[in-house]
Amino acid sequence: MTSATLTRVLGFLGLVPFMLPSYLMANAALFGSGLQSAAIFGLYGPYVFIAYSAIILSFLGGTLWAQARQSDDSSALMTILFSNLLALSAWACLLLIYIAPIMTVFSVCLLLAGYLGMLFAESLNDVSRQRKYWRMRLWLTFWVALAHLLVISLMMAEL
């Protein structure tokens, strides 16, 4: 198996922890007792979603850092700073859930913005010129964004 194939396989398998909690939360909201009944391993569904999302966004920030280190131009400095901003905002999302329900919704919005920002940042580097990888990133970001929008709408409906 090539590294490109492994990257694609792991990328799409990485959607499962986004989609499964989203499905369970939608099912609980539509057919159950609401999001409070959407437990995953005994944990509140939105918290599980946020935790995984924050970890993946931090990981992607690290990949952005690695891409920037391969370049010596001035944009590399901004990319490295942005990668740190992604990681810090993902960490903040893990803390925001303890403040108030509306801040939990805000944390999902912030994570969504992070994924869209990551895609934009990658579009500015050479990564967007790698056709197969870029197509995969677009699809993955589409599905991740859709899952975030679903979770946001489910949480807003319960406020």
Listing of model-derived features with the role each one plays in the protein:
Residues 123-159:
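Terminal transmembrane helical module of multi-pass membrane proteins
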Residues 94-117:
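Transmembrane helix-loop-helix
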Residues 21-26, 90-98, 145-159:
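Hydrophobic alpha-helical transmembrane segments in multi-pass integral membrane proteins
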Residues 1-70:
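Selected alpha-helical membrane-embedding segments in polytopic membrane proteins
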Residues 8-14, 74-84, 133-142:
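Cytoplasmic-side transmembrane-helix entry/capping segments in multi-pass membrane proteins
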Residues 64-96:
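Helix-adjacent hinge/juxtasegments
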Residues 60-72, 119-131:
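C-terminal ends of transmembrane helices
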